[in-house]
């Protein structure tokens, strides 16, 4: 407990003083009489209207059977109109404790042959991305909007009647609602009616959701009921009354003009086997030409004087030194070769001359270019083969 800051210690201070972190209850807080008087002064008429609405809804739910669903909805709408009038007159004070869902959206009556598409941006119960329409239920004797999840999202919206009405006209078979308090006939508000769009069962197609409903898939509902019209009927006449942000146009070609990959890949796959087969045909022909040519044996050139000296003295150097690297052994042999006198070197030069004469007798037409020019000959052969027609065929296959 934090101690008091008084001079008399813990118990010597003023009894009405207390710690700063404790709650100080006021004497006029929670007086039921004042709250009741304030509530009667603030909204006497609204409480009476709410009581009438609650009592009428309870009586209707007990008396009317479940078969007369349309009549119940119409009477519930009639009973809710005074509440809407009060809500329009007092927008700040007329909010319902259950969330006030009826303050923003208009009340719709049942029209046969119409599909109900309310304003998706203003209705609070459609902002969560759910496509299923709300069905009224009673919670604490007050109607509350709750979306239905047990049925298909689009089946409650579409009726099976072939009748069509203009959006701005009032149907003749529906009686006008009568306000019980004012005693005058009222029609549904005109700005709310254009949100109803006629849709025949034959022209119903796959309704594409707007951008806000990308998370939920929408399936075509034409298979759920019988179609009096052929399936090839154009949907443009019935769908033209919808706004453009709800139903996009028919899918056209790709924006970049590039065809779909599924269309291009079969052609590429057809070309690849041809190129592989061409390469397989080229390789055996080249190998066959090599096999047909006679294999000439590799003729070594005759040894010179230094190489004859290395051949003779290499075993002695390896025995004397522990080195096994060929480069180091060659360096030692080179130093010893240069250390020899002219007479000693002349002996190896004479051996080299005899080696050349013997080589010329054995291979009279031999030249050193035959050994060193093999790579150039191979390149020349490849160029000649490409010029003869093998190369252009391969390039044509890749085009």
Curated annotation (Swiss-Prot):
Compositionally biased intervals (Gly residues): 1-14
One Gene Ontology term from the biological process aspect of the record: epithelial to mesenchymal transition
Region (Disordered): 1-104, 166-192, 268-298, 369-399
Modification Phosphoserine occurs at: 132, 166
Region (CTNNB1-binding): 1-62
UniProt keyword DNA-binding, yes or no: yes
Entry GO terms, CC: beta-catenin-TCF complex; chromatin; cytoplasm; nucleoplasm; nucleus; protein-DNA complex; transcription regulator complex
Disulfide bonds: none
PTM characteristics: Phosphorylated at Thr-155 and/or Ser-166 by NLK. Phosphorylation by NLK at these sites represses LEF1-mediated transcriptional activation of target genes of the canonical Wnt signaling pathway.
DNA-binding region per Swiss-Prot/TrEMBL record: 299-367
Annotated positions of the Phosphothreonine modification: 155
Positions of crosslink type Glycyl lysine isopeptide (Lys-Gly) (interchain with G-Cter in SUMO): 27, 269
Location within or outside the cell: Nucleus
Biased composition annotated in UniProt, kind: Basic and acidic residues: 24-45, 82-98, 269-296
Keywords of the record: Activator, DNA-binding, Isopeptide bond, Nucleus, Phosphoprotein, Transcription, Transcription regulation, Ubl conjugation, Wnt signaling pathway
One MF term in the entry's GO annotations: transcription corepressor binding
Described purpose of this protein according to its UniProt entry: Transcription factor that binds DNA in a sequence-specific manner. Participates in the Wnt signaling pathway. Activates transcription of target genes in the presence of CTNNB1 and EP300. PIAG antagonizes both Wnt-dependent and Wnt-independent activation by LEF1. TLE1, TLE2, TLE3 and TLE4 repress transactivation mediated by LEF1 and CTNNB1. Regulates T-cell receptor alpha enhancer function. Required for IL17A expressing gamma-delta T-cell maturation and development, via binding to regulator loci of BLK to modulate expression.
Domain notes: Proline-rich and acidic regions are implicated in the activation functions of RNA polymerase II transcription factors.
PANTHER family hit by this protein: LYMPHOID ENHANCER-BINDING FACTOR 1, TRANSCRIPTION FACTOR 7 FAMILY MEMBER
Protein name in the entry: Lymphoid enhancer-binding factor 1
Organism of this sequence: Homo sapiens (Human)
């Amino acid at each position: 407990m934090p101690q008091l800051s008084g001079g008399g210690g813990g118990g010597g201070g003023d009894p009405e003083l207390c710690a700063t972190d404790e709650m100080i209850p006021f004497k006029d807080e929670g007086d039921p009489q004042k709250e009741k008087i304030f509530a009667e002064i603030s909204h006497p008429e609204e409480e009476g209207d709410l009581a009438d609405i609650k009592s009428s809804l309870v009586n209707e739910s007990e008396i009317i059977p479940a078969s007369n669903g349309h009549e119940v909805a119409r009477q519930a709408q009639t009973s809710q109109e005074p509440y809407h009038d009060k809500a329009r007159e007092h927008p700040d004070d007329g909010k319902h404790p259950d969330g006030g869902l009826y303050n923003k959206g208009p009340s719709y009556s049942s029209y046969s042959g119409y599909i109900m598409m309310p304003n998706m941006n203003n209705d609070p119960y459609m902002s969560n991305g759910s496509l299923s329409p709300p069905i009224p239920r009673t919670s604490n004797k007050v109607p509350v909007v709750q979306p239905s999840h047990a049925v298909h999202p689009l089946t409650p919206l579409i009726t099976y009647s072939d009748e069509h009405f203009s959006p701005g006209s009032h149907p003749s078979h529906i009686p006008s609602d009568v306000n019980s308090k004012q005693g005058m006939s009222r029609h549904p508000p005109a700005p709310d009616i254009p949100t109803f769009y006629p849709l025949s069962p034959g022209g119903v197609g796959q309704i594409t959701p707007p951008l806000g409903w990308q998370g939920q898939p929408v399936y075509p509902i034409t298979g759920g009921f019988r179609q009096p019209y052929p399936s090839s009927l154009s949907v443009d006449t019935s769908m033209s009354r919808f706004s453009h942000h709800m139903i996009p146009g028919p899918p056209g070609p790709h924006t970049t003009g590039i065809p779909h990959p599924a269309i291009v890949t079969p052609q590429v796959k057809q070309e690849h086997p041809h190129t592989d087969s061409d390469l397989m045909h080229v390789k055996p022909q080249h190998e066959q030409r090599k096999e047909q040519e006679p294999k000439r044996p590799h003729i070594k050139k005759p040894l010179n004087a230094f190489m004859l000296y290395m051949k003779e003295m290499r075993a002695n150097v390896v025995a004397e030194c522990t080195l096994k690297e060929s480069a180091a052994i060659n360096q030692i042999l080179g130093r010893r070769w240069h250390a020899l006198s002219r007479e000693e070197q002349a002996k190896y030069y004479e051996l080299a001359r005899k080696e050349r004469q013997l080589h010329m007798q054995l291979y009279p037409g031999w030249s050193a270019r035959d050994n060193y020019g093999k790579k150039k000959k191979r390149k020349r052969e490849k160029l000649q083969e490409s010029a003869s027609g093998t190369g252009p065929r391969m390039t044509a296959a890749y085009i």
